[in-house]
UniProtKB/Swiss-Prot annotation:
Annotated disulfide bonds: none
Subcellular location: Cell membrane
Protein name, per record: Elongation factor 4
SMART domains per record: EFG_C
Summary of the function given for this chain in its UniProt record: Required for accurate and efficient protein synthesis under certain stress conditions. May act as a fidelity factor of the translation reaction, by catalyzing a one-codon backward translocation of tRNAs on improperly translocated ribosomes. Back-translocation proceeds from a post-translocation (POST) complex to a pre-translocation (PRE) complex, thus giving elongation factor G a second chance to translocate the tRNAs correctly. Binds to ribosomes in a GTP-dependent manner.
EC numbers for this chain: 3.6.5.n1
Record-linked Pfam families: EFG_C (PF00679), GTP_EFTU (PF00009), GTP_EFTU_D2 (PF03144), LepA_C (PF06421)
Record-level GO cellular component terms: plasma membrane
UniProt catalytic activity: GTP + H2O = GDP + phosphate + H(+)
Length: 603
C-alpha cells in the first residue's frame, strides 16, 4: 500500500508522435503549476539542445517536479518525465516509462493516430501504465475530435469518452489534463524502509559535479553521503549531492524516498558507469535483486567519420569523447582508409541518431566531415564453423571462406492514407520487403506491416516513403533478428586499385544496378587525367560494370602537313607508349565531391 506521503505523488510521462504537441503541452503544464513564470517561458522548455528545437524532436529524457493544488484542495507533487519519441531511442523510452505509473497520450485532433504513437502506446501497456488519452490542437479548422476519439477506441482499445479536448498552443482546457493525472494515475508504491532500489532513467555529464544521474526510487531511501553501488557495473560511489529537478536547474535536498523522482551526483567520471536501466542500491545494505528490464544497448548502424582536413584527427577524437560523455550509446574506434586517411568507425542506435551526431559535430565543434555509407552488422558463418559479426565491408573474409551470410531484419509498421497503399507496397517490394499484414483503421487510413532488411531502410527509405505519399505516411520499426540472405561485397576499382571507402555489402540481385550507377557517378565526378582511368565495379574477381574517364591528349599530328602515314603512326605510337607508362606510375586523386556524390546515390 502507498503511504500518506506517496498518495500525494504522481509520476507520469507524455507520449506522442512527432509534432502532435508533446513539448508544447509540457510547457503549458509547467506554466499552469507555476514552475515557470511567463518571463521564463520559452517554447519547448524541456528540449534543451538546439537541434531538439529545430527538428521539433526530443532526444534526451528530462524530468521536472511540479506542485499542483487540485480541486479537492490537496497539494500533489507531479513528476513529469519527458521521453524521446523516436524509434532509435526506444530503449530510453522504455526506461523512462518504467519510472512512471501513468502516461498522457497526446493525439493530434487533425492527424489522428500515427505509427510512433502506436509503438509508444504498446511500450506503455507493456509496463502496465495507466494511459490517459488527450486530444490536442482542437483549435485547428481541420480538427475532428469525435473521429479521433473513435480511432483511439478502435485501434488501441482505450476508452476515450472522457479524454480532455485541449489546445496546448492556446492554453485551452489544460487544467483538465492535470485533474485527470491526479484522478487517474495511481500513486507510487514501495516500502521506504526496504533496501534501496532505484532505477536510472538518464544521466548527463556536468563538468563541475561529474555525472548527474536521474533516478526513480522504487524502494528504500537514498540519503546524502550514502555509499551507493550500481548493480550491473558493480561500481561504488559516495553521494555528494541529491535533490530534484526543475527546468533549467537542480534543487539540492537531503534525501529521496520510495516513489520519488530526483537526481544524485557522486563524483562519477564516466557516463558508462551509470547505464540507463541499471539499479542503484546502497553498498552497506544492498538489495538482493536488481530491477528487471536492463539491457545493454548495442549500436545498429555504423559508418566511418573522417575529418575533411586530416590534421584535425585529434580534435575529432576529443569531440567524439565529449559527445560520448552524454551519450553512452555512441561507440567509436579509430580506423584508417587509403582514400580518406585517418578517422573513426562510429556505431549508432539508428539513422536519426547518426544524423544528430553528425550534425552536432559539424555545428557545435565546427568540423568539416566526410562520412562513408552507413552499414549494418552482418552475421557471417565461415566454412570452418566460426561466426563473425561484420560492421565494415573491408573486414569481410574472402568469398571462398564464407558459408552463409545473414542480415538484420526489422518489422516495419507503416500508417498511410488509403490512396497511397499501392505506392507503399511497390516501395516495400523494391526494398525486398515481405508483406505481413494490413489493417484498416478507418475509412481513410491503413496500417501496413512488412518485414524489411535493415540494410534497405538505413539509406533513404524514409525519404522515399515520404515522397511517395506526399508526406502523409509514418513509419516505425523494431528489430526481429537475423535472416540468411544472398549478400555479396561490391568493390570499386580505380585504375586497377580497390578504393576501400567505396566498398559496399549489397544483395546479389541489386549488385549490378548499384555497381553500374556508382561507376557512372564516379565518371562524372573524377577529373580527367593525362592518362585514361578505368572505373570498374567488381564482385570478387568478376567485373560487372565499367566506365572510362578519357585522357587529355596533345595533338601530336599538328605539325605534320601531308607526308607519309608511317610518320604519323610513329608519333601516335610514341604518345600511346608514354600514356601507358604514365598510367603505370600515375595515381588517381579522388576528390571529396566524388565520394559525396557516390554516398548520396539513391540506393
Amino acid at each position: 500500500m502507498a503511504s500518506e506521503r506517496q498518495k500525494k505523488i504522481r509520476n507520469f510521462c507524455i507520449i506522442a508522435h512527432i509534432d502532435h504537441g508533446k513539448s508544447t503541452l509540457a510547457d503549458r503544464l509547467l506554466e499552469m503549476t507555476g514552475v515557470l513564470t511567463e518571463r521564463e517561458m520559452e517554447d519547448q522548455v524541456l528540449d534543451t539542445m538546439e537541434i531538439e528545437r529545430e527538428r521539433g524532436i526530443t532526444i534526451k529524457a528530462q524530468a521536472v517536479r511540479m506542485v499542483y493544488k487540485a480541486k479537492d484542495g490537496e497539494e500533489y507533487i507531479l513528476n513529469l518525465i519527458d521521453t524521446p519519441g523516436h524509434v532509435d531511442f526506444n530503449y530510453e523510452v522504455s526506461r523512462s516509462l518504467a519510472a512512471c505509473e501513468g502516461a498522457i497520450l497526446v493525439v493530434d485532433a487533425a492527424q489522428g493516430i500515427e505509427a510512433q504513437t502506436l509503438a509508444n502506446v504498446y511500450l506503455a501497456l507493456d509496463h502496465d501504465l495507466e494511459i490517459l488519452p488527450v486530444i490536442n490542437k482542437i483549435d485547428l479548422p481541420s480538427a475532428q475530435p469525435d473521429v479521433v476519439k473513435k480511432e483511439i477506441e478502435d485501434v488501441i482499445g482505450l476508452d476515450a469518452s472522457e479524454a480532455p479536448l485541449i489546445s496546448a498552443k492556446n492554453g485551452i482546457n489544460i487544467e483538465a489534463v492535470l485533474e485527470s493525472v491526479v484522478k487517474n494515475v495511481p500513486p507510487p508504491e514501495g516500502d521506504e524502509n526496504a533496501p534501496l532500489r532505484a532505477l536510472i532513467f538518464d544521466s548527463y555529464y556536468d563538468s563541475y559535479k561529474g555525472v548527474i544521474v536521474y533516478i526513480r526510487v522504487k524502494e528504500g531511501t537514498l540519503k546524502l553521503g550514502d555509499k551507493v553501488r550500481m548493480m550491473y557495473t558493480n561500481k561504488e560511489f559516495t553521494v555528494t549531492e541529491i535533490g530534484y529537478m526543475k527546468p533549467g536547474g537542480l534543487v539540492p535536498g537531503t534525501q529521496l524516498s520510495a516513489g520519488e523522482v530526483g537526481y544524485f551526483a557522486a563524483s562519477i567520471k564516466n557516463v558508462k558507469d551509470t547505464r540507463v536501466g541499471d539499479t542503484v542500491t546502497t553498498a552497506d545494505n544492498p538489495a538482493k535483486e536488481p530491477l528487471p528490464g536492463y539491457k545493454k544497448v548495442n549500436p545498429m548502424v555504423f559508418c566511418g567519420i573522417y575529418p575533411a582536413d586530416g590534421s584535425k584527427y585529434g580534435d575529432l577524437r576529443d569531440a567524439l569523447e565529449k559527445l560520448q560523455l552524454n551519450d553512452a550509446s555512441l561507440t567509436f574506434e579509430p580506423e584508417s582508409s587509403v582514400a580518406l586517411g585517418f578517422g573513426f568507425r562510429c556505431g549508432f542506435l539508428g539513422l536519426l541518431h547518426m544524423e544528430i551526431i553528425q550534425e552536432r559535430l559539424e555545428r557545435e565543434f565546427d568540423f568539416d566531415l566526410v562520412t562513408t555509407a552507413p552499414s549494418v552488422i552482418y552475421k557471417v558463418t565461415k566454412t570452418n564453423g566460426e561466426t563473425l559479426y561484420i560492421d565494415n565491408p573491408t573486414n569481410l573474409p574472402p568469398p571462398a571462406e564464407i558459408k552463409t551470410m545473414e542480415e538484420p531484419i526489422v518489422k516495419a509498421t507503416i500508417m498511410t492514407p488509403t490512396e497511397y497503399v499501392g505506392n507503399i507496397m511497390e516501395l516495400a517490394q523494391e526494398r525486398r520487403g515481405i508483406y505481413k499484414d494490413m489493417t484498416y483503421i478507418d475509412e481513410g487510413r491503413v496500417m501496413l506491416t512488412y518485414e524489411l532488411p535493415l540494410n534497405e531502410i538505413i539509406y533513404d527509405f524514409f525519404d522515399a516513403l515520404k515522397s511517395r505519399t506526399k508526406g502523409y505516411a509514418s513509419l516505425d520499426y523494431e528489430m526481429l533478428g537475423y535472416r540468411e540472405s544472398d549478400l555479396v561485397k561490391l568493390d570499386i576499382m580505380l585504375n586497377g586499385e580497390i578504393v576501400d571507402a567505396l566498398s559496399f555489402i549489397v544483395h546479389r540481385e541489386k549488385a549490378y544496378a548499384r555497381g553500374r550507377r556508382i561507376a557512372e557517378k564516379l565518371k562524372e565526378a573524377i577529373p580527367r587525367q593525362q592518362f585514361e582511368v578505368p572505373i570498374q565495379a567488381c564482385i570478387g574477381g568478376k567485373i560487372i560494370a565499367r566506365e572510362t574517364v578519357k585522357a587529355y591528349r596533345k595533338d601530336v599530328l599538328a605539325k605534320c602537313y601531308g607526308g607519309d602515314i608511317t610518320r604519323k603512326k610513329k608519333l601516335l605510337e610514341k604518345q600511346k607508349e608514354g600514356k601507358k607508362r604514365m598510367r603505370q606510375i600515375g595515381t588517381v586523386e579522388v576528390p571529396q565531391e566524388a565520394f559525396m556524390s557516390v554516398l548520396k546515390l539513391d540506393t
